[in-house]
């Protein structure tokens, strides 16, 4: 099933836009409204599974927290394992971490050291691509463990915030179902 214009429009219309959230001047794209619509949620998963079903993916990695909501069902659809990337202190076994910059400060992500094997072909899934900092850190974790990042897939791309370009500089192609301006 290749995504049709009608299907993509349905997904776009299922995502609510909230003015001045979380602060004045921001137009927030709320993917939780898509999750509330079982048809839209299933369609988003089905379209991603269809796109990657013959790509040789061996693992799907999702970033905390909404990346879990899309990455885990995509992994099931592809018949491969799902690997969560989390904030510090949330994973029980041995981890490695990667620090990345935020607008005002830094944050950190962790992955289990045994979650990715050398040669794994990995699809990174998250709900939204904005500046790309979180996904760039996720890619670095995967590569440190010997994994190959095949692609990064998103439900929403805030295309004017530079995330695609940032990932391209890391050699990562990205795919999104619904493009929106970032402001």
Curated annotation (Swiss-Prot):
Pfam families listed in its UniProt record: Pribosyltran
Key words, A-Z: Cytoplasm, Glycosyltransferase, Purine salvage, Transferase
Reactions performed catalytically: AMP + diphosphate = 5-phospho-alpha-D-ribose 1-diphosphate + adenine
Superkingdom of origin: Bacteria
GO biological process: adenine salvage; AMP salvage; purine ribonucleoside salvage
EC numbers: 2.4.2.7
Family annotation (InterPro entries): Ade_phspho_trans (IPR005764), PRibTrfase_dom (IPR000836), PRTase-like (IPR029057), UPRTase/APRTase (IPR050054)
EC top class, as a word: transferase
Pathway: Purine metabolism; AMP biosynthesis via salvage pathway; AMP from adenine: step 1/1
Localization annotation: Cytoplasm
Keyword Glycosyltransferase: yes
Recorded GO CC terms: cytosol
Gene Ontology MF terms: adenine phosphoribosyltransferase activity; magnesium ion binding; protein homodimerization activity
Function: Catalyzes a salvage reaction resulting in the formation of AMP, that is energically less costly than de novo synthesis.
Family in the record: Belongs to the purine/pyrimidine phosphoribosyltransferase family.
Complexes and interactors: Homodimer.
Entry-linked HAMAP family: Aden_phosphoribosyltr
This protein's name: Adenine phosphoribosyltransferase
UniProt source species: Escherichia coli (strain K12)
């Amino acid at each position: 099933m290749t995504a049709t214009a009608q299907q993509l429009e349905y997904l776009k219309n299922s995502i609510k836009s909230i003015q001045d959230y979380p602060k004045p001047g921001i137009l927030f794209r709320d993917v939780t409204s898509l999750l509330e619509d079982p048809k839209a949620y299933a369609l988003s998963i089905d379209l991603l599974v269809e796109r990657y079903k013959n790509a040789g993916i061996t693992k799907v990695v999702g970033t905390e927290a909404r990346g879990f909501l899309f990455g885990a069902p995509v992994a099931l659809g592809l018949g491969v394992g799902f690997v969560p990337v989390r904030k510090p202190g949330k994973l029980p076994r041995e981890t490695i971490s990667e620090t990345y910059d935020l607008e005002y400060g830094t944050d950190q992500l962790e992955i289990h050291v045994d979650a990715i094997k050398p040669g794994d072909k990995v699809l990174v899934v998250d709900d939204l691509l904005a500046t790309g900092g979180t996904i760039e850190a996720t890619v670095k974790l995967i590569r440190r463990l010997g994994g190959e990042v095949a692609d990064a897939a998103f439900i929403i791309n805030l295309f004017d915030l530079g995330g695609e370009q940032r990932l391209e500089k890391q050699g990562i192609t990205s795919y999104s179902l619904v493009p929106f301006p970032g402001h």
